[in-house]
Amino acid sequence: MSFPDITPDLKAAMPSLRGRLLGNEPLAPLTWFRVGGPAQALFTPADEDDLGYFLSRLPTEVPMLCIGVGSNLIVRDGGLPGVVIRLAPRGFGDTRADGEIVYAGAAALDKRVAETAAAAKLGGLEFYFGIPGTVGGALRMNAGANGRETKDALIDATAFDRSGNRRVLGNADMQFSYRHSGADPALIFTSARFRGTPASPDAIRAKMNEVQAHRELAQPVREKTGGSTFKNPPDNSAWKLIDAAGCRGLRVGGAQVSEMHCNFLINTSDATAADIETLGETVRERVKAQSGIELQWEIKRIGVAVDAAR
């Protein structure tokens, strides 16, 4: 599927644009599942000023969405109308430590945040070492692991609104809850500051090694996957409910529930986005029938659905 090319009109309205603006750009290569259709327009800003300029000139009727490295994302097969904004490491991937504060651009990998803190002998951010994704995604969904979440370390975050205005949100402004931020969904986060705690380098490294070892042992890290598919219900584990419902190894088309960890869906070879989403909905139905519990998606699903699963 392809969309009418809107990039000539956008470029004409933005003569000072420095970033890259492409029409009908495939999104599948930008996601861990490697599925999905194109973006009607894909914009990669050069830096914060370029992003603010683009947003200030973007017509309000044009849909807009920001993505990261696509580690927690299903792009549907029909693609996304409007503009998809993707922050690149070159302009938004810096990390550094200053005293007990760790600064990170929104395109920095979560793992890099943990490494930067460790190099500065700061603990409290080791949990990021095992989270696949970027700081921007961590802010949007209050990413966490091993008993800690983004809300436990965040000082503040910088973002741009739909009109191109720069804003700074404190921890309370983020309205964090389990795997969710109540901040305006139209905001595009560009950086964040985290507070670390001075700690022994050996102790920090030991925690990071433990996080990595657990992930390697328990999760299908070498598959085309998207991380944890469903949120854990209160006082329960999604994977246990999925296993009890007999869904381990279940397949739809080229999509499969992981044998290693059944809260992970994997693209075994040639899955479509429809295969993966249909498999997820089948799992939800079976869990509801078996336990009465309705699982909630943790993976974000975006775009236009066009093909039924095979």
Swiss-Prot record:
Top-rank lineage group of the source organism: Bacteria
Family to which this protein belongs: Belongs to the MurB family.
Pathway annotation from the record: Cell wall biogenesis; peptidoglycan biosynthesis
Organism: Rhodopseudomonas palustris (strain BisB5)
Domain FAD-binding PCMH-type: 35-199
Gene: murB
Keywords: Cell cycle, Cell division, Cell shape, Cell wall biogenesis/degradation, Cytoplasm, FAD, Flavoprotein, NADP, Oxidoreductase, Peptidoglycan synthesis
Role: Cell wall formation.
Lineage, broadest ranks: Bacteria, Pseudomonadati, Pseudomonadota, Alphaproteobacteria, Hyphomicrobiales
InterPro entries with a match to the protein in the record: FAD-bd_PCMH, FAD-bd_PCMH-like_sf, FAD-bd_PCMH_sub1, FAD-bd_PCMH_sub2, MurB, MurB_C, MurB_C_sf, Oxid_FAD_bind_N
Enzyme category, top tier: oxidoreductase
The EC number(s) this enzyme carries: 1.3.1.98
Cofactor: FAD
Name this protein carries in UniProt: UDP-N-acetylenolpyruvoylglucosamine reductase
Subcellular location: Cytoplasm
